[in-house]
Regions:
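Well-ordered mid-protein domain cores that form the structural environment of catalytic cofactors
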Residues: 136, 145-146, 169
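Residues on a specific face of well-ordered alpha-helices
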Residues: 21, 129, 133, 137-138, ...
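A short glycine-rich beta-alpha junction/loop motif
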Residues: 16, 110-118, 149-180
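A generic structural signal for short beta-strands and their flanking turns/coil linkers
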Residues: 48, 66, 114-116
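Structured loops at beta-to-helix junctions and adjacent beta-edge loops in soluble globular domains
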Residues: 26, 52-55, 123, 171
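Sequence-specific dsDNA recognition surfaces
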Residues: 20-41, 55-88
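A short beta-sheet element
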Residues: 53-54, 72-140, 152
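Non-catalytic DNA-recognition/assembly elements of restriction-modification systems
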Residues: 2-35, 169-202
């Protein structure tokens, strides 16, 4: 297995065959967040189902450091905006370029995405972790932001349709698993070092 330096386009290649797919062929489901009028300020409660915001989409996987909540009944009424473990969440308005997956170790069974986000459910061709890692590479970010408008609040034009037309190269599942394991190991080391530094500074 070769890990020699590659170009941005060849990120993650392990000397394996890659196939190119439009995202529409890699997902089973895509859904936009609710209209703003469907989640007003008076909808929020002290406990319930978490509603995601931009601070939850920093890094590769969902951050659970800060939430606002709606009742289970309200979340039920926003069924298409409910995101579950294994789903991928993308920002389409505001801080563009954000994309995370919800890990199987997530604290909650479900979440509600905001009006500035959309979610996808990957099919069996691609691991959600690999899918997200790809879009954190320079070439992935370029493709993700290719339909961005900078007039007013930054936003992706027609996000659900344009996103599905993006073509990406993916290897076989076994290679995806190797990449995910490698990057996961690096993330763990980085997190551990950060915790050590925080303890030393305390």
């Amino acid at each position: 297995m070769s890990l020699r330096p590659r170009s941005g386009r060849d990120w993650g290649r392990l000397d394996m065959n890659y196939n190119t797919y439009p995202i529409a062929d890699l997902i089973d489901e895509i859904a936009m967040g609710p209209f703003g009028s469907n989640i007003k300020v008076d909808c929020f409660v002290d406990k319930g189902i978490p509603v995601l915001n931009g601070s939850n989409l920093e890094g590769f996987e969902l951050s659970e450091k800060s939430f606002r909540y709606v009742t289970e009944e309200k979340a039920d009424s926003l069924k298409k905006a409910n995101a579950y473990k294994g789903d991928v969440v993308i920002t389409h308005r505001g801080t563009l370029g954000q994309i995370v997956y919800i890990p199987q170790t997530a604290q909650r069974d479900r979440y509600v995405i905001s009006q500035s986000q959309f979610r996808v459910k990957c099919n069996k061709k691609v691991l959600p972790e690999y899918f997200v890692y790809y879009f954190h590479t320079p070439i992935g970010q370029h493709k993700l932001l290719s339909n961005a408008s900078q007039v007013g609040v930054p936003a992706l034009a027609r996000p659900s349709s344009t996103f599905q037309k993006i073509e990406i190269e993916i290897p076989d599942l076994e290679t995806q698993k190797k990449v995910v394991k490698l990057i996961g190991s690096l993330q763990t080391r980085i997190k551990t070092n950060a915790e050590i530094n925080d303890n030393l500074a305390a």
